[in-house]
Amino acid sequence: MEKILVENPNRFVIFPIEHNDIWEYYKMHQAAFWTAEEIDLSGDLRDWENLSENEQYFVKNILSFFAASDGIVNENLAENFYREVQYPEAKFFYGIQLAMENIHSLMYSLLIDTYVSNEDEKNKCFTALDNLPAVQKKAKWALDWIENASFQERLVAFAAVEGIFFSGSFCSIFWLKSRGIMQGLCNANALIFKDENLHCDFAIHLLNNHIENKPSEKRIKEILLSALEIEKEFITESLPVSLIGMNSNLMKQYLEFVVDGLLVKFGCKKQFNVEQPFKFMEQIAVETKGNFFESRTVEYQKAKLNETLSFTDDF
């Protein structure tokens, strides 16, 4: 059995830190903590009403997919990874990841609630797993891996969900950012994008550095490439990016570029050797996050340290 999975009687206490590399991932995530209420959506509704019917359809379904997917990710975290790992540092990371995934889920629900006024239509967005076949297919792939694979292979599949299944959708929203519209959506997208990249990198780091019995390169490629085919179908056929004016062939190339990057991180050879086709993706996420945090008012305090709690208050 992998050492990280062997029962550890000291798993309930974090000190002394024994795995500093894992602890650093936790501290990085802690430093990047944000809340859905920080995102200003006040200007988005005007832009939303100016979108074409096709553009609205695309954004609604992307948000529906994201809202459903975070629930699946959380189930894997809560039901499996958090329970299985015995290093307290890893439990800390999965704990904060679970909290952030909840914030992502709330963010997507707030976005849908803000943009979609028709209650029946809104309900369809909130129940995408029941109503959208394209979302169902991706969900089935993820759930099959969650329920039926070894810990080692689930790390690879989890990286595929975070790194491939979300990548086309993230990219399409950044495309809207490059057009100067939907600022609130784009700010949320930038923050979630960076969170999910960290989650993906953590799964890869665990496999590369804390797992002895790693899946073969052939198996890793099989998992990633099967996820790639589903994502290509989703973002270029089931919910084509052409609806918002993007080039589907370039999106396929972008997804192949993403998969090559993941393969290299896993220590495997590239499969496609393609270039990044979207120049706007190179800096936009970093710039958006920086601008967002710079725009915060100085009065905002995450922990509200300036507030005092009176123990005479009613609870």
Predicted regions: what is each one?
Residues 1-315:
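Non-heme di-metal
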